[in-house]
């Protein structure tokens, strides 16, 4: 797949060939869904917790004798049916993480990249750099390229001025190539790759 390389000012600066093994697959929604679910499950804190009847600060003495009062049979006031009693089957501290094989994760990344390529939502830039860490300057460059919701993936190191300038834009994410992931690719409208990022992806899936 041949794609035009542009500068940050929107000027053409050659072309690059994207591998069909990475960018030319037919996207499968089921694989993408599995990977996004796996990512989001690992983000959940799992620190929710309530106290059971054995943990609350209340006496464990029987409320009244078993027989002879005419009332229903009850044990301690810490039982779940009483106000202030312990929670029955409440949430406990646990991990929400699920497992996903490495090969499926790698395949999902290829399908995410392919889905953007198929929708013509990939832009390749020769490099992404700014003279000053100014959000206004970055927005002007995005206006020339017609970008709003965008994920920028650079090489091994993200240019510091770009990272600082993009930090104040709510729909712009900047990642080094080792941080590229399915969820962040899909949640933004446009994927911007530098030539260094394309080379790194080609080497990664060689």
Swiss-Prot record:
SUPFAM superfamilies: Ribosomal protein L4. Keywords: Ribonucleoprotein, Ribosomal protein, RNA-binding, rRNA-binding. One of its GO terms (cellular component) is ribosome. One of its GO terms (biological process) is translation. GO terms for molecular function: rRNA binding; structural constituent of ribosome. It holds the Pfam family Ribosomal_L4. The keyword Membrane does not apply. It comes from the Bacteria. InterPro entries: Ribosomal_uL4, Ribosomal_uL4-like, Ribosomal_uL4_dom_sf. The keyword rRNA-binding applies. One of the primary rRNA binding proteins, this protein initially binds near the 5'-end of the 23S rRNA. It is important during the early stages of 50S assembly. It makes multiple contacts with different domains of the 23S rRNA in the assembled 50S subunit and ribosome. Forms part of the polypeptide exit tunnel. Belongs to the universal ribosomal protein uL4 family. Part of the 50S ribosomal subunit. This is Large ribosomal subunit protein uL4. The gene is rplD.
